[in-house]
A protein has these predicted regions:
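C-terminal domain-boundary segment and adjacent tail
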Residues: 12, 60, 91-96, 100-103, ...
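Metal-dependent polysaccharide deacetylase catalytic core of the NodB/CE4 family, i.e.
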Residues: 5, 9-100, 119-132
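Long hydrophobic alpha-helices with heptad-repeat/coiled-coil character
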Residues: 61, 65-68, 122, 208-219, ...
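Extracytoplasmic cysteine-anchoring/structural motifs
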Residues: 115-116
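C-terminal beta-strand-rich structural cap/linker in extracellular carbohydrate-active enzymes
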Residues: 228-248
Length: 248
């Protein structure tokens, strides 16, 4: 299953609301792209505010899920209007890479490899697959691209924009207090973001010569640990209690 972000501008949506809800129910993110796609630089703030809120309300009413990200119409990020768009969001799209008629297997693979090499996040954006603006000349090229990304899942994490934006924000805001003892670590996380908005678990990596066995517990629950030759990896709750790590 490949989850994606669908950016909806409701006044011109070419899907029924039942189809949009079906996508949402299957785990795809439905994001806000403005009710009438109003360019922030060309309309008064009150019209921009209405355009954003009206789309939020329509998406929530028809899917049951409030959009927590925003995609700027025409990529215009006028500062005063941007202050409205970011309210009650985990993030807004400030960069993207267009994927469509000009995409080749080579430049798509190069893009992904560069993201891996530079430890960066990438936001792929396509308007249409088989028809519409900048649609693929051969739609199979897009599916092949997804298969290539899937084959690299040990090196790359693919998530919806909401998931990735929340993760990045949480990672930057989380403080870890670490006490090292013999064959034991006590790690206390602290995160003060809005836990109703920022709900992603974080991943902790312990690097070094691998032990035969590593176990981790938080709030009385065992945390699944992935062991590699040079590191151990596990997810944890940044709002939770002390993480006890035993190294054997």
């Amino acid at each position: 299953r490949r989850q994606r972000q669908m950016c909806i501008r409701d006044s011109t949506t070419r899907m029924s609301w039942s189809q949009v809800k079906d996508l949402s129910d299957r785990g795809h993110e439905i994001s806000n792209h403005g009710w009438k796609h109003k360019n922030f630089a060309r309309f008064p703030l009150e019209e921009i505010r209405e355009d954003i809120y009206k789309n939020d309300s329509a998406i929530f009413a028809n899917t049951g899920v409030m959009p927590r990200t925003f995609v700027y119409p025409n990529n215009n990020k006028k500062e005063e209007a941007k202050k409205i768009a970011v309210q009650n969001r985990v993030g807004t799209r400030t960069k993207q890479r267009s994927i469509g008629s000009k995409s080749t297997p080579q430049n798509l693979e190069s893009w992904v490899n560069t993201l891996i090499e530079t430890n960066d996040w990438g936001v792929g954006m396509t308007h249409g697959l088989t028809y519409g603006y900048d649609a693929f000349r051969n739609p199979q090229r897009f599916w092949d691209h997804l298969d290539q990304v899937k084959a690299k899942e040990d090196k790359i994490w693919v998530g919806t924009f909401r998931e990735v934006a929340a993760y990045v924000e949480e990672k930057g805001a989380t403080q870890l207090d670490i006490v090292c003892e013999k064959n034991h670590l006590r790690i206390t996380p602290e995160l003060t973001l809005d836990k109703e908005l920022f709900i992603e678990p974080l991943t902790l990596v312990i690097k070094g010569k691998q032990k035969k066995k590593i176990s981790a517990r938080q709030d009385g629950k065992k945390l699944p640990v992935q062991l590699h030759t040079d590191k151990a990896v596990f997810d944890f709750n940044p709002y939770g209690g002390v993480i006890e790590v035993n190294l054997k």
